[in-house]
Each structure stands twice: as structure tokens, then as C-alpha cells.
Amino acid sequence: MGCLGNSSKTAEDQGVDEKERREANKKIEKQLQKERLAYKATHRLLLLGAGESGKSTIVKQMRILHVNGSNPEEKKQKILDIRKNVKDAIVTIVSAMSTIIPPVPLANPENQFRSDYIKSIAPITDFEYSQEFFDHVKKLWDDEGVKACFERSNEYQLIDCAQYFLERIDSVSLVDYTPTDQDLLRCRVLTSGIFETRFQVDKVNFHMFDVGGQRDERRKWIQCFNDVTAIIYVAACSSYNMVIREDNNTNRLRESLDLFESIWNNRWLRTISIILFLNKQDMLAEKVLAGKSKIEDYFPEYANYTVPEDATPDAGEDPKVTRAKFFIRDLFLRISTATGDGKHYCYPHFTCAVDTENIRRVFNDCRDIIQRMHLKQYELL
């Protein structure tokens, strides 16, 4: 009997346990409330757009501007990716010389063995980037035939950073090469899956989600739609004369327009506004001024397009460039105004994702818009 009496808790002990439970529950509830408030205070931005539009470069800019950029170890890890970009670029160009119509011969026949060497190493995945490789690349890039083939790169699939890194082959080949911020911005690595970047601007928390833009990646987008503050849609304006990698047939800008329309009219996104980044303005200007690929050859309606009276060109901007960029802007705005129901809006901005100052300025301009969307999202406006 004595043993049974000792095993039961006194009323006083039970009271202490109950008090501890209540205090523990209070702490948990307080923490949950804190997390709920932090969640509500966070601006969630979803980056969407077709493949190779510049979404990942925008994320890199946010890291440079708001997360102290990349540390030395991260830069070191990117060296292999950058050298792979060089290899992919030169392999693609020399391989295309014989396949485009009409084909392009080497200007210097003595470079033939170099071209053969580059083609021979194309399938090697764990390639050792020797000085021999860099010497061959440098000589080939100096060949006028290779340059002529590069000028026709809209006829085949070439990464945007090809010229940038081929022109910097001397520094990229150095044993003690350290990538610059601009090198990191230019480096092309295929985005597969969903990547989240967190940063803070003036004590406001932002979560930016970058998802792959290729067709087979888009099924993953739906996972990111929950509680999104705003969509940043990135369109490569310079792609008006290019075709997508997936089928080598569909015009890239048409694909971007179709994708934008499907997002704009998506029933799950009818209340989420879109910030439209009309990207690659630097490359668009180069193409327009070069005059080799005319926009009207791909978009016949351009022939009758007139720049709106309220259009404001950049200082010193060529009128041909102004007309081209506003034409592309209006292609997207035509979609948003045709089916808009007043529940969401489209805010266009001209961007150059590799230009840090441009992205700083544009993102600062967007912050007020994002804040208004956030207040509306939680019915505070």
C-alpha cells in the first residue's frame, strides 16, 4: 500500500506540470505568431519566362546588390562552368560552319587541324582545360571565317555569353584566374528545378524564386504559385530572330509572348500583377543597329508600327532602337490590356540583366509597386 501511495502525484505536482504545459504552449503559440507575422511581412517574387531569357542573371544581381555578392570560394567553383562555356561556344561555332546554309569556310586553312581538334574534344565531359586547348580557341576566334559564322548565330543555338568569354580567353586561361562579378553574371548554367534566394532591402524581406524556363521545366511552376506577391516575367527582346532549343523551329519571342499570355490568363494568377522585364536591351540595340536581321521579317506588323507619342527614349538613343523596343513592349501590353479585368496589372521595364546599375535602378522603381501588391494581398489596402 505504501508503494502505491508513493507512486501517485500530489495535487501540487500536477499543478506544477499543468503550469509548465501552459507556459510551453504559450511559447509555441508566440513563436508561431512570430513566424506568421514574418511570413506575412515577406514579399515573395516569382521569376518566370522562357528559357535563356535572363532570369538567373536577375537573381545573381540581387545577390550582388543585396547579399554581398559571391565569396572567393563561390567564385573559384564557377571557373569550371566558365571554361565549359568557352568550350561549348567554340564547339558550337566551328560545328555550325559546315551545317548552316550556305556554309562558312575557315579564312585560314592552316586552322583546319585546330577545328578538327575542337570537334574531337566536343563529347568529352570531364575535359582537362589545357593550355593547348586555350591556344587553339584563341587562334580560331581570330579566324575571320569563325567570326563570320558567329555573326550568323541566330541560325543555330549559341549561348549568349559566347562572344564575351571568347574575347576574354587570355584571362580565362590563366592558372590563377579569378572570375569578376561580370564574369559570374555572364556565365551560363542551365537552371533545373526551383531555386530560392532570400535578401533584405531597407529591412523588408524578399524571397525570390527562380525556376527553369525550358518547356519541360514549366510543370514545376505551379508549386510556386501559393502566396506569391508578384510575378517578374523576363522576356529576351533580342530573341526576335531566334528559335527555341526545344524544337529548333518556334520563334523565341513568339514563344515568350505565348507563355506570357498563358500566365496572364491563368485562373490561379488572375489577381497577381506582373512586373515585365523587357530584357537584353543591349543585345537588341546591337542587332537593330547592325541591320542584318530586320524585325519585320519575323513580325510583319512592325512595318506599320508607330512609336507612341508618350514614349521616352534613353539619352542619345538611336530612333531605330527606340522604335524596336517599344514595339516589343506593346506586343506584351496588347495581351495584358486585351483580357485585363482590373484585378491585376502589367508594369513594363526595359532591362539589361548584366548591367548592375540598370537592375539596381529598375528594382528600386519596382519596390513601391511590390509594396502596394503586398498590402493588397493581405487586404491592407
Swiss-Prot record:
GO terms for cellular component: acrosomal vesicle; apical cytoplasm; ciliary necklace; cilium; cytoplasm; heterotrimeric G-protein complex; plasma membrane; sperm midpiece. InterPro entries: Gprotein_alpha_S, Gprotein_alpha_su, GproteinA_insert, P-loop_NTPase. Mg(2+) binds at residues 56, 191, 210. Its main location: membrane. Residues 1-25 are annotated as: Disordered. It is found in: Cell membrane. Residues 41-381 form the G-alpha domain. The keyword Transferase does not apply. Keywords: Cell membrane, GTP-binding, Hydrolase, Lipoprotein, Magnesium, Membrane, Metal-binding, Nucleotide-binding, Palmitate, Phosphoprotein, Transducer. The keyword DNA damage does not apply. GO terms for biological process: adenylate cyclase-activating dopamine receptor signaling pathway; adenylate cyclase-activating G protein-coupled receptor signaling pathway; cellular response to dopamine; regulation of long-term synaptic depression; response to amphetamine; response to caffeine; sensory perception of chemical stimulus; sensory perception of smell. GTP binds at residues 52-57, 185-186, 191, 213, 279-280, 282, 353. SMART domains: G_alpha. It is a peripheral membrane protein. It is an enzyme of class 3 (hydrolase). GO terms for molecular function: G protein activity; G protein-coupled receptor binding; G-protein beta/gamma-subunit complex binding; GTP binding; GTPase activity; metal ion binding. Guanine nucleotide-binding protein (G protein) involved as transducer in olfactory signal transduction controlled by G protein-coupled receptors (GPCRs). Contains the guanine nucleotide binding site and alternates between an active, GTP-bound state and an inactive, GDP-bound state. Signaling by an activated GPCR promotes GDP release and GTP binding. The alpha subunit has a low GTPase activity that converts bound GTP to GDP, thereby terminating the signal. Both GDP release and GTP hydrolysis are modulated by numerous regulatory proteins. PANTHER family: GTP-BINDING PROTEIN ALPHA SUBUNIT (PTHR10218), GUANINE NUCLEOTIDE-BINDING PROTEIN G(OLF) SUBUNIT ALPHA (PTHR10218:SF233). This is Guanine nucleotide-binding protein G(olf) subunit alpha. It comes from Rattus norvegicus. The gene is Gnal.
